[in-house]
Amino acid sequence: MKLLFKFDDSSFYKSTCVFLNDENHSWRDEYVRIYLDILKFDSSITLADLSIDKDYVSTDVMDAVIDKDKVYLGFSLHLPEDRPADYDPSKEIYYIIDREELMYLARRWYSFIERPVELKRPNYQEIIDSEEAYK
């Protein structure tokens, strides 16, 4: 998966994460892009803590459930023990990504948005290939 990290043209203080439009794009890539774009720092710490093998690390917009070395990204997700009485598994919409790959993308995203103000230029961008997580 390839993502493009860039600073918004209208305000170089706003960073944006978009998927790199290529023939390999999938809905999974789009879910990852949305999740990264709104990921909170405390959720990324939980994601990186490998001693946690099950947890709910959602954002304001999207649910995320860690299950050992996989992360489920989607909507209407619950940990098995937290499912409501009227739980309907057919309402779960999700895509699975390797936890290692998502951690790599989150680290790259945070290093991008934490750049010093003087280095945040409107035309600056980085292309991130998640395959680098496995090298």
Predicted segments with their positions:
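Broad, structure-driven detector of short, well-ordered beta-strand segments within folded domains
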Residues: 1-7, 11-12, 60-66, 121-125
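Intrinsically disordered, low-complexity segments enriched in small/polar residues
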Residues: 11, 29, 33, 54, ...
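Generic secondary-structure transition motif, activating predominantly at the C-termini of alpha-helices
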Residues: 36-40, 110, 114-117
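Amphipathic protein-protein interaction modules
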Residues: 51-114
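Short, well-ordered strand-loop elements centered on a beta-strand within folded domains, enriched
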Residues: 13-21, 71-76, 111-113, 120
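Negatively charged, low-complexity tracts enriched in Asp/Glu with abundant Ser/Thr
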Residues: 1-56
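Short, highly charged C-terminal tails/helix-capping segments
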Residues: 118-135
